[in-house]
Amino acid sequence: MKSSAKFLLTTASALLLSVNALAADYTFTTPSLALPATSGNGLTGQLWTNVDPNTDTLAQAQAIIAGGYATANFLATTIDYPVGAAGSTSVFSTYGAVLDATAQATLDNTAVLPDDVLNTVMRFAGFFGVQSANEVWTFTLPSDDGSALDIQGTRVLNNDGIHAFSGPTRTVEFTMPGLYAMNVLFFESQPSDWGLELRGGLNGATPTTAISSRLYNLITYADPNDDRLGSIQPNNSVPEPASLPLLGAALLGAFAYLWRR
């Protein structure tokens, strides 16, 4: 074989190996929704508090989520709990100590703030925004204890079990722009350190928790038929204070009508 042909063959083989080395672990081709004109601002954080202290697996955590409304919901601009340096964990913290200002300002049940984070199931639900075709993202999900990342119902990162702060890394390719359904699951049931971080990096960049602009919350962007919305308790139907006199007058009128009959 001529030297020039050998060179071309060697170069082609090297390129093929390079492409194979960069092949994503998972590929998603069809977005759940169209990409909005605005950037994202985080996922919908959900808490199921004071759960069974023997909740030690993702399967148990998912059963709790499926079994009833979330105790509280809020806007999670980043998945970084407790907020701090990468890999930071804490012991026996309350929600009031670990939720950032945005989370506390958007919390729909402030009664949870004095609660200890132990014996808790969390879900961060919404969508991941892809701006260009063929984006390849590297995701990592270190946690203490168990966690998982699901994209369009596929478990991309599985970090199940009781363990110290650590987690897997996977690459994901999105072939089309749009919003892709995303859930981050987490549970903590042991009286010890706990923590959770979702990190992402585009096209080989070092993964970081600063990906808020790619995260779109469930409440604002989900289709009304999205079954994840069923975990959010409907608003209390108690009338507004200004409407109470009108309601009272209406009831008195009804009673008077019935009495005359």
Per-range role (PLM):
Residues K2-L9, A242:
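Bacterial N-terminal signal peptides that target proteins for export
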Residues T10-S18:
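Bacterial N-terminal signal peptides
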Residues V19-A23:
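Sec/Tat signal peptide C-region and signal peptidase I cleavage site
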Residues A24-S237:
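Acidic/polar, compositionally biased interaction segments
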Residues P239-L258:
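A short, hydrophobic C-terminal helix/tail in secreted or cell-surface proteins
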